[in-house]
Every structure is written in C-alpha cells, then in structure tokens.
C-alpha cells in the first residue's frame, strides 16, 4: 500500500520508517524540506509540496498527519481538503 505522511518530527519519521519496513511505500512531506531529503535517503518517496504529495498517491488516498495538535492540524486539513477526492482518508496522528 502507498500512504502519504505529513510531518517528519520524531514520531512521524519513526512511523514512516516502520511503515516502510513493513512493505508500504511512503510518500513524505515536511515543511522543513531537508527532512524530506533525509527520508528519501532512507527509501521513502519525497514530496516537496502538498500538491506533489497528493499527485504521487493513486486511487483512494490515505494521508497520515503527524503535526502538532491544534492550529497546525486545522491549517493542514484546510490546505489538503481542496486537493482530495470524496473517499480519500486523512488520519490525524498529532498529539499535544
């Protein structure tokens, strides 16, 4: 399965590694683009914009948000929704 993951902090990066280690293709985006480059070195698929992340996912998209809870999540969802289709899935994995 190919999944999208936004947020490559400690939790997001380790979740991406775990998914990769279990056979999933992981498309990653982070506002700090250097973290995307590092993830690419670990075999993940880098995306340098939200639009690029969405385009790299096929079929029913699954996008996991690993950004801090609160306004960051709300802002990210408001940017993502116009790019997605009706049956795409957003998972909020952020915590406070």
Predicted regions and their residues:
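NAD(P)+-binding Rossmann beta1-loop-alpha1 motif at the extreme N-terminus of oxidoreductases
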Residues: 1-65, 83-88, 93-94
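Beta-loop-alpha module in the N-terminal Rossmann-like domain of NAD(P)-dependent dehydrogenases
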Residues: 66-79
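Short, surface-exposed acidic/glycine-rich loop or hinge patches that mediate macromolecular interfaces
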Residues: 70, 95-96
């Amino acid at each position: 399965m190919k999944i999208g993951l936004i947020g490559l902090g400690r939790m997001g990066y380790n979740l991406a590694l775990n998914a990769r280690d279990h056979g999933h293709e992981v498309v990653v985006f982070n506002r700090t683009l250097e973290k995307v480059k590092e993830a690419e070195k670990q075999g993940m698929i880098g995306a340098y914009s939200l639009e690029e992340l969405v385009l790299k996912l096929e079929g029913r998209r699954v996008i996991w948000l690993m950004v801090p809870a609160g306004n960051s999540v709300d802002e990210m969802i408001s940017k993502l929704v116009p790019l997605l289709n009706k049956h795409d899935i957003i998972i909020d994995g952020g915590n406070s």
